[in-house]
């Protein structure tokens, strides 16, 4: 145990086992941040984009925002007959995920997500999410969701930040949902979140100005929408992108193909059903990984095997080890 502590003081990525994946990260960062290197990239251009669900924290047994939506529906349906009559709400409460996830942009899921916040001000929605996060726990690990993050990816975020990178979340999840907690959980400020967005409207009330959320969708930040969102909301092409599914395929392509700067792509492959979950081509819910995995060797993308490359997956694993060592 003492060796692990000593290593963590000198190794910027101690949760990563030595090997090809870790070496590829260290090598890329060194070459783009070392002054005088032919591959040096100025700090303003060091943009890194990260998917969230399945890349920075688990998307199983259901994505975290979906768990929030289900809990909100269960809370409201008994007193809101109109909401209870919606077929998509009924599908959600019956556990019919296939119906909700049908279509390229998960129209059913987007619809019920909108139902949980339509008519709320942005401040009210933020308070609702905060209250839920304060009591909700991951059903398998029994920990608050903010503690069930991937320790190796958290180390990577901090390593990149220390080397002048600006990290962005680029996720199919709701931007307003993620902005509530990303700074506390990942150290990423809310203005560096690109996600699916709905229409809001301005109102001047007696208490002051507010923004009110509506049922209308503006932008779905998934699949081919991710490069579009990057251009619209970031305005710079990333030099590094990190994902875990075919939903991140276009973002990886946009980052690494014909980029005038050196670039890096990484795919987190879920291969550990003991410590987390194992899935790729035939996931139960989301996270299908076929095309991006097939293209990775051609593009030089790093494929992270969670089982082989990560000696720790979650921060609380280290707490358990410390207790065993005492």
Give, region by region, the residue ranges found by the protein language model:
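Asp-based phosphoryl-transfer active-site loop
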Residues: 43-61, 252
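C-terminal cap/substrate-recognition subdomain and adjoining C-terminal extension
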Residues: 2-16, 20-26, 30, 45, ...
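A metal-dependent, Asp-based hydrolase signature
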Residues: 61-147, 151
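Short loop/turn motifs at secondary-structure junctions and domain boundaries
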Residues: 38-42
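Charged, low-complexity surface segments at secondary-structure and domain boundaries
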Residues: 7-14, 55, 95-98, 109-115, ...
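Active-site phosphate-binding and catalytic loops of NTP-dependent enzymes
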Residues: 35
């Amino acid at each position: 145990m003492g060796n692990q502590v000593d290593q963590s003081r000198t190794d910027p990525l101690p949760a990563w086992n030595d090997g090809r994946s870790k070496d590829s990260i260290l090598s890329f960062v060194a070459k783009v941040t070392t002054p005088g290197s032919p591959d040096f990239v100025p700090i303003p251009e060091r943009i890194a984009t990260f998917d969230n669900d399945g890349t920075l924290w688990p998307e199983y047994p259901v994505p975290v925002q979906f768990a929030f939506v289900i809990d909100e529906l269960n809370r409201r349906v008994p007193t809101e007959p109109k909401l209870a009559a919606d077929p998509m709400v009924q599908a959600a409460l019956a556990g019919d995920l296939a119906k909700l996830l049908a279509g390229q942009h998960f129209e059913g899921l987007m619809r019920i997500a909108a139902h949980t916040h339509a008519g709320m001000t942005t401040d009210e929605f933020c308070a609702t999410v905060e209250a839920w996060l304060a009591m909700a726990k991951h059903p398998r690990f029994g920990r608050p969701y903010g503690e069930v993050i991937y320790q190796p990816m958290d180390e990577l975020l901090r390593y990149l930040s220390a080397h002048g990178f600006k990290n962005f979340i680029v996720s199919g999840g709701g931007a307003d949902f993620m902005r509530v907690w990303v700074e506390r959980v990942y150290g990423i400020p809310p203005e560096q979140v690109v996600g699916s967005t709905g229409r809001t409207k301005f109102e001047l009330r007696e208490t002051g100005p507010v923004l009110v959320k509506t049922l209308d969708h503006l932008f779905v930040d998934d699949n081919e929408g991710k490069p579009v969102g990057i251009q619209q909301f970031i305005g710079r092409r990333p030099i590094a992108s990190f994902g875990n599914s075919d939903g991140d395929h276009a973002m990886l392509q946009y980052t690494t193909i014909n980029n005038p700067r050196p670039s890096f792509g990484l795919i987190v492959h879920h291969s550990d059903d003991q410590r987390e979950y194992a899935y790729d081509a035939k996931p139960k819910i989301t996270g299908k990984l076929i095309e991006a995995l097939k293209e990775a060797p051609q593009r030089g993308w790093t494929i992270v095997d969670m089982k082989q490359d990560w000696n720790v997956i979650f921060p609380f694993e280290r707490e358990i080890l410390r207790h065993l060592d005492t």
